[in-house]
Amino acid sequence: MFKRKSTAELAAQMAKLAGNKGGFSSEDKGEWKLKLDNAGNGQAVIRFLPSKNDEQAPFAILVNHGFKKNGKWYIENCSSTHGDYDSCPVCQYISKNDLYNTDNKEYGLVKRK
């Protein structure tokens, strides 16, 4: 698993870290920093590159349900986020009891109100 290091080696590493006060080198050439004008304002253009895999969405899709009943909130992520559409009890209830799916005429009347 882990190898024990000599205490002298550990002390040398600690001394090296203690010498760098902030723990960050401001002279890091690989880090990009926004250039500011005299007023302290900066501007940058951010480009979103296309995904390497065309089938995968370039963002994460998260489906959740949230509603209040009897003074209590129910907020949970839906299993349809992961493609499991059948095991979500909220989705099952909505599909069985939603007026749009069950009684389209009554849905039209409620929608008008």
From Swiss-Prot:
Homodimer in the absence of DNA, monomer when binding DNA. Interacts with the DNA helicase assembly protein; a ternary complex between the helicase assembly protein, the single-stranded DNA-binding protein and ssDNA is an obligatory intermediate in the helicase loading mechanism. Part of the replicase complex that includes the DNA polymerase, the polymerase clamp, the clamp loader complex, the single-stranded DNA binding protein, the primase, the DnaB-like SF4 replicative helicase and the helicase assembly factor. Interacts (via C-terminus) with the viral SF1 dDA helicase. This is Single-stranded DNA-binding protein. Residues 3-7 are annotated as: LAST. The keyword Kinase does not apply. Single-stranded DNA-binding protein that participates in viral DNA replication, recombination, and repair. Coats the lagging-strand ssDNA as the replication fork advances. Stimulates the activities of viral DNA polymerase and DnaB-like SF4 replicative helicase, probably via its interaction with the helicase assembly factor. Together with DnaB-like SF4 replicative helicase and the helicase assembly factor, promotes pairing of two homologous DNA molecules containing complementary single-stranded regions and mediates homologous DNA strand exchange. Also promotes the formation of joint molecules. Keywords: DNA damage, DNA recombination, DNA repair, DNA replication, DNA-binding, Metal-binding, Repressor, Viral DNA replication, Zinc. Belongs to the Tequatrovirus single-stranded DNA-binding protein family. The acidic C-terminus is involved in modulating the ssDNA binding properties. The N-terminus LAST motif is involved in the cooperative binding of the protein to ssDNA. InterPro entries: NA-bd_OB-fold (IPR012340), Phage_T4_Gp32_ssDNA-bd (IPR012339), Phage_T4_Gp32_ssDNA-bd_sf (IPR044947). Zn(2+) binds at H65, C78, C88, C91. GO terms for molecular function: metal ion binding; single-stranded DNA binding. GO terms for biological process: DNA recombination; DNA repair; DNA replication; viral DNA genome replication. It comes from the Viruses. The gene is 32. It comes from Escherichia phage SV14 (Bacteriophage SV14).
